[in-house]
Amino acid sequence: MTNAEVTIAVRHEPMRIAGRLVDTDDRVEVRYPWNDTVVGTVPAGRAEHAREAFAIAAAYQPKLTRYERQKILLATAEALAARKEEISDVITLELGISKADSLYEVGRAFDVFTLAGQMCIRDDGEIFSCDLTPHGKARKIFTMREPLTAISAITPFNHPLNMVAHKVAPAIATNNCVVVKPTELTPMTALLLADILYEAGLPPEMLSVVTGWPADIGMEMITNPHVDLVTFTGSVPVGKLIAANAHYKRQVLELGGNDPLIILNDLSDDDLARAADLAVAGATKNSGQRCTAVKRILCQESVADRFVPLVLERAKRLRFGDPMDRSTDLGTVIHEKAAALFEERVMRAAEEGADILYHPGRSGALLPPIVVDRVPHQSDLVLEETFGPIIPIVRVPDDDDATITLSNSTAFGLSSGVCTNDYRRMQKYIAGLKVGTVNIWEVPGYRIEMSPFGGIKDSGNGYKEGVIEAMKSFTNVKTFSLPWP
């Protein structure tokens, strides 16, 4: 047993409803995936708890100035940086990712709050002169943005801090009230973030965090009459359930992906080594539990025999094990059931003709970086969203049209990465790939926290996340005009 395991203290957290601590007799256990021990409990909240939170949000009229919003957001960012060890411990304990990955997540959340703080003092209202045509008048038309009644934010397990930050920070920046329902698997980080925001000066009525089982509280998060917008990050089935039940409410749905990294045949040996670095890092960071993780590597046939050994070499270097050990590169996935499912997909791919090149063995939720070559492109391993540190290589023809067709042949359309030095081929793939983002010489998921991000097809409903796009989605545009002699 490690020292980290010996010193774990179980956290019993209440909900935060407009700053008030609310508990229930029934509790939801939060387990450490590394050893399946209970590391915390949260209330098994019910619909009435969400209903109360939305009623408070709807009744409150935020009056924060842009300066005050910026001050709160930047103070939150600084608190995240100052408390990064404590916060990353909570993330690792409830999610199982390595300390290196959880510290990186805290850094990303710092970026979100910093950028939201910078953007909230910027006024993007527009002015239109009306004397532009023979039918014009001596007037000017102006636009301004106003907050919504209440925002419902439903967040996934794989980024317990950053996904909450991406919904809460833009809401604060636009003077909105938001109710957050984190997944029951990793709820404790969201509760800690709420406390940090209250301490930074956020009026408590502007933020509530409710917890509980989806069957008990989920539908209220979607259908409550005070909710103007539902923002959700998570699985495709749940996203479609929200779309079917939210009806006329606005929805920002960021769903799954099976993002490709595409390796083209114009690469030198040095280029292939660089591409292998991207492939392995993109497939295994955060234990592969990212919607934008590299979930299939499409390698053109004529360079595959040179590329695959480079991937194998890098995968074998990864240290996997105790997430709290500072030397660990790769921690666990969310639970043993998920690890077993992804391992089963690997074995099924092998039955379909794939070659398992590296699989040092699974232990509970600890799934190692498994390298699989010659995966059939119709295998579930690469057709479905395999949310773990699997490194599947699909050999594709030395033909760009055929490669693009294969890349587009799944139900998802989130993002992709392409490794090529040919500018004309870059343009062809940017135009031809049916995804929300194309990154050249970078992993599919690369972005900064304020750039537009989102998918098409089953990966989302076309609305974008990122601080700037979220601030637009979280507001109504009011148009008014004045005489202007």
From Swiss-Prot:
Phenotypic consequence of residue 108 to A: Decreased catalytic activity and decreased affinity for phosphonoacetaldehyde
Enzyme class, broadest EC rank: oxidoreductase
Result when mutating residue 254 to A: Loss of catalytic activity
Single annotated GO MF: nucleotide binding
EC number: 1.2.1.-
One matching Pfam family: Aldedh
Pathway: Phosphorus metabolism
UniProt-listed InterPro entries: Ald_DH/histidinol_DH, Ald_DH_C, Ald_DH_CS_GLU, Ald_DH_N, Aldehyde_DH_dom, ALDH-related_metabolic_enz, Put_phosphonoacetaldehyde_DH
Catalytic reaction list: phosphonoacetaldehyde + NAD(+) + H2O = phosphonoacetate + NADH + 2 H(+)
Source organism, top-level taxon: Bacteria
Keywords, ordered alphabetically: NAD, Nucleotide-binding, Oxidoreductase, Plasmid
UniProt keyword annotation of Oxidoreductase present: yes
Binding positions (substrate): 108, 159, 290-292, 447
Active-site residues, Swiss-Prot/TrEMBL: 254 (proton donor/acceptor), 291 (nucleophile)
Binding annotation for NAD(+): 155-157, 181-184, 235, 385
Matching NCBIfam families: PhnAcAld_DH
Subunit and interaction comment: Homodimer.
Function text: Plays an important role in phosphonate degradation by catalyzing the NAD-dependent conversion of phosphonoacetaldehyde (PnAA) to phosphonoacetate (PnA). Has low in vitro activity with the related compounds phosphonopropionaldehyde (3-oxopropyl phosphonate) and glyceraldehyde 3-phosphate.
PANTHER family: ALDEHYDE DEHYDROGENASE
Family assignment from sequence similarity: Belongs to the aldehyde dehydrogenase family.
Protein name: Phosphonoacetaldehyde dehydrogenase
Organism: Rhizobium meliloti (strain 1021) (Ensifer meliloti)
Phylogenetic lineage: Bacteria, Pseudomonadati, Pseudomonadota, Alphaproteobacteria, Hyphomicrobiales
Gene: phnY
